[in-house]
Amino acid sequence: MASAARSASRAFLRSTPTTSSFRPAVRAARFALPAQGFRAAGRRGYASEANSGKSSSNVFLWAGLAVAGGAGAYLYLNGSDSVTSKTFVPGKEDYQKVYDAIARRLADETDYDDGSYGPVLVRLAWHASGTYDKETGTGGSNGATMRFAPESDHGANAGLKIARDFLEPIKAQFPWISYSDLWTLAGACAIQELGGPTIPWRPGRQDKDVAACTPDGRLPDASKDQRHIRDIFYRMGFNDQEIVALIGAHALGRAHPDRSGYDGPWDFSPTVFTNEFFRLLVDEKWQNRKWNGPAQFTDKTTKTLMMLPADLALIKDKEFKKHVERYARDSDAFFKDFSDAFVKLLELGVPFTSKAEDRYVFKTSE
């Protein structure tokens, strides 16, 4: 049902002229949350006096905790001060429960832009991953260092506290998942729940401390041209086709003057993942917007949409433009290429122990 509804939405959008004021309803599906399969509980052990045996046990306890922290293992002290090991190794079903919890929260919480937090979750996953530098091996989704200043204060990350806070109840419900895995899983979930392509995903990211924060300037600057775009994306290891596909995420959401300085949505359906961004980029006439903000463009037909200087650079550059035109004509090609590029983005710099063929494919909500 969900896939049929998404297909119908995309088909309707393809037949809707650019002057349409169509705004699709947000997914309102409801489903029961699966019961959590375990409880992470810590009981502090107290002893009236120390002896060599207890000291040795404590050494092993803390060593065990240090090793187990990234693997979902929990150690407990029982009433007799002995150590009991309970190991929890999450599998696909456990991550599906996390996915379902995010999807339900997206359906329930509709008090954000255009009725969905989905677009800002995609932006969080994108910005957490897009700091990767292939030469130094630093940055990327492994670490979730946007939890800390100065990275959380970088201009490109303005407004993403909303997305991070949105996911805190999910983190509390599933404390075993790292923030790094949670943020990227949330991005994959949002893409699928908003009608986009399947995003295969795998766990394995570990959170890092503030020392791993990346320097400012690694994310794309919307005011720049194609040379800047290539500099940013080539640094991560993407080619021109992948660059255009990833920028297609602008099909979702809108810009905010109090964050990026820009204003407005890119298309008429900012909570449905489509190829409309490319269709409008090619078919619509774009003119400079006259306002007090930074330079941006507005559509000549309705004057309600916007494009960024970096967006227009995609059709000014011959190599970029051929991919824009292909995606404008072929939604299926865009969906496939976006999925491949987004999976690559989410995995940059992650020291996985699993293989690519072990990625999970999550069921969408009904």
Curated annotation (Swiss-Prot):
It comes from Aspergillus fumigatus (strain ATCC MYA-4609 / CBS 101355 / FGSC A1100 / Af293) (Neosartorya fumigata). Belongs to the peroxidase family. Cytochrome c peroxidase subfamily. It comes from the Eukaryota. This is Cytochrome c peroxidase, mitochondrial. Coiled coil: none annotated. It is found in: Mitochondrion matrix; Mitochondrion intermembrane space. The record marks R123 as: Transition state stabilizer. Residues 1-46 form a transit peptide. Keywords: Heme, Iron, Metal-binding, Mitochondrion, Oxidoreductase, Peroxidase, Transit peptide. Binds 1 heme b (iron(II)-protoporphyrin IX) group per subunit. GO terms for cellular component: mitochondrial intermembrane space; mitochondrial matrix. Destroys radicals which are normally produced within the cells and which are toxic to biological systems. PANTHER family: CYTOCHROME C PEROXIDASE, MITOCHONDRIAL, THYLAKOID LUMENAL 29 KDA PROTEIN, CHLOROPLASTIC-RELATED. Heme b binds at H250. It catalyses: 2 Fe(II)-[cytochrome c] + H2O2 + 2 H(+) = 2 Fe(III)-[cytochrome c] + 2 H2O.
